[in-house]
Design a protein with these regions (language model features):
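Glycine-rich beta-alpha junction loops
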Residues: 182, 204-206
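Short, active-site-adjacent cap segments at secondary-structure transitions
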Residues: 116-118, 206-209
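Generic structural signal of hydrophobic/aromatic residues within well-ordered alpha-helices
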Residues: 38, 77, 93, 138, ...
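Extracytoplasmic/periplasmic ligand-binding sensor regions of membrane-associated signaling proteins
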Residues: 90, 98-179, 185-188, 197
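Extracytoplasmic/periplasmic ligand-binding sensor domains
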Residues: 174, 207-213
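Juxtamembrane extracytoplasmic/periplasmic/luminal helical "stalk" adjacent to the first N-terminal
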Residues: 7-13, 18-87, 95-106, 113, ...
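Alpha-helix N-cap/helix-start and coil->helix boundary motif
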Residues: 18, 183-184
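Short, Lys/Arg-rich, polar N-terminal cytosolic tail immediately upstream
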Residues: 1-5
């Protein structure tokens, strides 16, 4: 059996083995550290993207809520809604509807308790249905008298809504419901404003459907 008798050779081998083990440990640690840093960077980027999307939704919701606040505070609007005067509402709001649509806010609807549509400025011939089954925020706004912002299914598509109850003599008589489409226009504005890549999907209980990207 071969034996190493030289102390110098033994020392060199021992040092070499120690260095090799140390390099292996450091290499393993370096790879793990690199993976950890990469994952951290990805997590931070995902959070940044998520925060940007939430900020975009919040921005659109605040804009819709601001419009609903103004509309609900107009005495002629409150009077027309109370009388179910759709022609009067059209005369008051048709011009504003065109301007708002150009700004990405294409939906204005008025509902009476519990959530019966009185008039849609954007679709004046469609009214009278109870939307409480799909618009819980409308029911809540009329019930509590509080302003609400939320994302819910509209008549044709998912939208971001801001709503303000309309009161007369201290009683809630209706709800001013203003919506920003949660579709291509929203995606385009979010991409431009925050510099993010974004797609919107909806879930119908069985599968996801892409709405816009």
């Amino acid at each position: 059996m071969f034996k190493i008798r030289s102390i110098a050779v033994r020392l060199i081998l021992a040092i070499s083995l120690t260095v090799a083990v140390a390099c292996a440990i450091l290499g393993t640690f370096s790879i793990a550290q690199q993976r950890s840093l990469t994952q951290l960077a990805l997590d931070q980027q995902l959070k940044l993207q998520y925060d940007s999307v939430i900020a975009a939704i919040d921005y659109e919701g605040r804009a819709a809520l601001a419009v609903s606040s103004v509309v609900a505070a107009l005495p002629p609007v409150a009077d027309a809604v109370a009388r179910d005067d759709r022609d009067g509402l059209a005369a008051l709001l048709d011009g504003a509807m065109k301007a708002l649509t150009a700004q990405g806010i294409p939906l204005i609807t008025f509902q009476k308790p519990p959530a019966v549509v009185v008039y849609r400025v954007h679709a004046p011939k469609v009214f009278g249905e109870d939307i409480s089954s799909r618009r819980s925020t409308v029911v809540e706004a009329i019930k509590t008298g509080k302003q609400i912002v939320g994302v819910e299914p509209g008549r044709e598509a998912l939208s971001i809504f801001g709503m303000t109850p309309i009161t007369r003599d201290g009683k809630i008589v209706a709800n001013a419901d203003v919506g920003a489409a949660f579709g291509k226009e929203f995606v385009d504005r979010a991409k431009k404003r925050f510099g993010i890549d974004l797609a919107v999907h909806s879930y119908d209980g069985k599968a996801f459907k892409k709405l816009s990207s």
